[in-house]
Amino acid sequence: MATILFKVIMMKELILLEEGWSVMKTGVAKLQRILEDLSEPPFDPGQYINLYTIIYDMCLQQPPNDYSQELYNKYRGVVDHYNKETVLPSMRERHGEYMLRELVKRWANHKILVRWLSRFCFYLDRFYVARRGLPTLNDVGFTSFHDLVYQEIQSEAKDVLLALIHKEREGEQIDRTLVKNVIDVYCGNGVGQMVIYEEDFESFLLQDTASYYSRKASRWSQEDSCPDYMLKAEECLKLEKERVTNYLHSTTEPKLVEKVQNELLVVVAKQLIENEHSGCLALLRDDKMGDLSRMYRLYRLIPQGLEPIADLFKQHVTAEGNALIKQAADAATNQDASASQVLVRKEIELHDKYMVYVDECFQKHSLFHKLLKEAFEVFCNKTVAGASSAEILATYCDNILKTRGGSEKLSDEATEITLEKVVNLLVYISDKDLFAEFYRKKQARRLLFDRSGIMKEVTDITLARELQTNFVDYLSANMTTKLGIDFTVTVLTTGFWPSYKTTDLNLPTEMVNCVEAFKVFYGTKTNSRRLSWIYSLGTCHILGKFEKKTMELVVSTYQAAVLLLFNNAERLSYTEISEQLNLSHEDLVRLLHSLSCLKYKILIKEPMSRTISKTDTFEFNSKFTDKMRKIRVPLPPMDERKKVVEDVDKDRRYAIDAALVRIMKSRKVLAHQQLVSECVEHLSKMFKPDIKMIKKRIEDLINRDYLERDTENANTFKYVA
């Protein structure tokens, strides 16, 4: 039995252009009545679907009845007609704030109009417009408003906006919401770009701002003191930033602030900062820290704005320091034996005072640190009654350590704090080697004559040895379990020895047991003292079992802590070592570098390089060997500083000789002036070499055949290998 299938094609009724568009016109008219608040009910779903379907069907009809292009043109015509016949007349009959309110209303209505018309014509926009590469219906709609409405209104709107902003600057209340909404019209007409906003409004705002604050600066600078002027300037900057927050576009802020800063601060900077009665020097003189902080805040964001303030700061500190030197010199002339000691105390007080200024008023800015240093270098290197600053400082330290502050009888902590402050001053002394020599001699005198405070440095060693003997006896009598390692502790008294860096090192178990045992023992001797462990001074002898032989390694406590980790793991990452030992990155890099990158490579580092990074891994180098069975694995010092232990002049001659030879060995051939300059630079950290002395040392090195003059140019020297 055969089955017959019938295919039925339903043909839609053809919609002519005018017929279909008449339906659309009805919908457009309804939409416009809604926008004009003419009590028109909203679209119901059926009406919306009907309008959408009309456009859809007219776009799908076969040519020549495909009316896509015609509908696209009519869409443009509808929007243009509405803007010309309805929007523009309503705008033209209003002025001032009323015009702005109408502009905001019409812009909001226009966005609604475009959104609804685009929804009705969605199929047209989605396919026909996209295929032809035409401007979207949204773009067509907004271009119409821009060309027909915005272009005619924007200039007047700009003038009204600027007038409102001027009123607010003068203290009047304005409708900020209205201003913000109008600004949104400028931004919205850029269609995602800020060019229109910047050219049509922002540029005029910036010009107006500059003119306004130029007038204010001229009047205020004549009427107000520097502190009062700065208060007003700070308030103006705050209010301008609030304006950006309240109604301007965020991109305007840096430009607006720059204009205000330029007119209120940059243009009048010299007049303001150098004001004789209330400027920077007057604020420093009167200790007006709040005003100085404000001056710093105002000028810190201006390029080179802080330089004149910092220069005056240096000038003021230098003047105060020179006054102290003069007072001390006058007192010394009057046979006041304590003049130099009083000078150091006052210099310390001066340094403490202005360090507070640098930290609090100037937020630790490097420029103020630099110029404070330069100021102190000026007067801290002057002589008083024939005594150099190096000798005066050394004598002050000697008196503190001998008499513990004289009549004040300083505590251990106060003594240490005072000495730290002296060290702060020592940074500014050019002849540090001279200070070291004076200090060494005075220290020897204290020890020889059994003066109180410093003798602790000697007696501590004796007491520490006795304490160690008692500890050994204690272990023999009380410990049922042996510690497993020989453990020696040297106990020193805080306050009479140099301070050392302490860390919260996580000790290996082997060491922890020893430390805890000593703590228990020490608790039986005293319960009023606290032990602070200085691991950086410790030394460990550990056995390394390598493939070829077992070797004794002499290492620091830190190095030992690292190596002992590899008893429990064949391979460890940098992060694992760091977490287990609880060491800083700087300390751990130094340790791992000493064990894997220098002469004795106890550890193998991957990847192989001369630097340590946080991604490196390490493993025990079982193949390591050396001809010696006992080796000392050096740990590079944190800071190497040349110490002068003999006569200063002789030491300087040796230092200059060494510097000259080192420079010439590196450079081979060098002109006289360049050699002298490099030598001065090379030695300036410890002292300022005398130019005449350098010339004499060059001649001496020539006589000893280290250097020779160039045969063609007597002012050029050659290194003799």
Curated annotation (Swiss-Prot):
InterPro entries tied to this protein: Cullin, Cullin_homology, Cullin_homology_sf, Cullin_N, Cullin_neddylation_domain, Cullin_repeat-like_dom_sf, WH-like_DNA-bd_sf, WH_DNA-bd_sf
| Gene Ontology MF annotations | ubiquitin protein ligase binding
A single GO BP: ubiquitin-dependent protein catabolic process
- Looking at the record, the residues that make up the Cullin neddylation domain are 651-713
Record-stated family: Belongs to the cullin family.
Q: What is this protein called?
A: Putative cullin-like protein 1
Q: Which organism is it from?
A: Arabidopsis thaliana
